[in-house]
């Protein structure tokens, strides 16, 4: 469903942000 798609995208975005921050620190 749409909710699952949004959750999946959100998790991907959060993982991307976490990886980006890890590279800075």
Swiss-Prot record:
The keyword Secreted applies. It is found in: Secreted. Transmembrane segments: none annotated. Has antimicrobial activity, but no hemolytic activity. Preference on killing Gram-negative non-enteric bacteria. One of its GO terms (biological process) is defense response to bacterium. This is Bombinin-like peptide 4. Its main location: secreted. It comes from Bombina orientalis (Oriental fire-bellied toad). Expressed by the skin glands.
């Amino acid at each position: 469903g749409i909710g699952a798609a949004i959750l999946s995208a959100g998790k991907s975005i959060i993982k991307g942000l976490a990886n980006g921050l890890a590279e800075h620190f």
